[in-house]
């Protein structure tokens, strides 16, 4: 049971496949009198072929001038510590199994804003052919004019990359406060990116399994 919680990792885009994997592992490690081991932290739903590496995205955003606070990236360490505790729990009784679940949920909540950043970056690869760019000025070449005017996403991306915007917090919330065309364009872009990420089940190994990476 301890090897199961520490060393077995898996991901599949089909939720039923993930549940069947859990069932097979539970049957293989069944112990009379003990609850089923908590496995949600290591067996997850997602598309393993479509995800991003956190350091790559972090570097790409910094090149474009985005504000990235180190405190936001400290979330990775906190989540890893919580998940390390989950792996150390034996789930020998209901109380330990519940604690495993609570710690895993706390880790997921910590990682959610970073997950949103990776989802956004991956979605831009789909929405803007040629993304990423190494200079914001190159974006205009990737986005065609609309009715003779610059594409509204140019304003939206510029607004998100503004050094006065905490990008991780904004993407985590999914909404940029304020009014105006640039803010509206940014919110429309984030909405489309989030919908695409949900629909395609993007899976980022770096944030899904922080104890490994």
Predicted features by range, described:
Residues 1-213:
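SAM-dependent methyltransferase catalytic region
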């Amino acid at each position: 049971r301890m090897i199961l919680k520490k060393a077995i990792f898996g991901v599949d885009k089909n939720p039923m496949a993930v549940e069947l994997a859990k069932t097979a592992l539970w049957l293989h490690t069944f112990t009379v009198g003990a609850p089923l081991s908590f496995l949600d932290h290591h067996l997850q739903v997602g598309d393993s072929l479509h995800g991003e590496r956190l350091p790559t995205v972090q570097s790409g955003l910094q090149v474009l001038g985005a504000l990235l606070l180190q405190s936001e990236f400290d979330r990775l360490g906190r989540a890893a510590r919580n998940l390390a505790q989950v792996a150390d729990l034996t789930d020998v009784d209901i109380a330990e199994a519940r604690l495993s679940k609570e710690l895993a949920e706390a880790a997921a909540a910590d990682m959610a804003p970073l997950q949103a950043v990776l989802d956004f970056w991956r979605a831009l690869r789909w929405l803007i052919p040629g993304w990423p760019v190494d200079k914001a000025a190159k974006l205009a070449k990737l986005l065609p004019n609309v009715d003779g005017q610059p594409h509204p996403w140019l304003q939206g991306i510029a607004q998100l990359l503004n050094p006065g915007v905490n990008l991780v917090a904004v993407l985590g919330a999914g909404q940029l406060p304020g009014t105006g065309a640039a803010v509206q364009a940014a919110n429309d872009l984030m909405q489309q990116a989030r919908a695409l990420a949900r629909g395609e089940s993007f899976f980022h190994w770096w944030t899904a399994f922080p104890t490994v990476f």
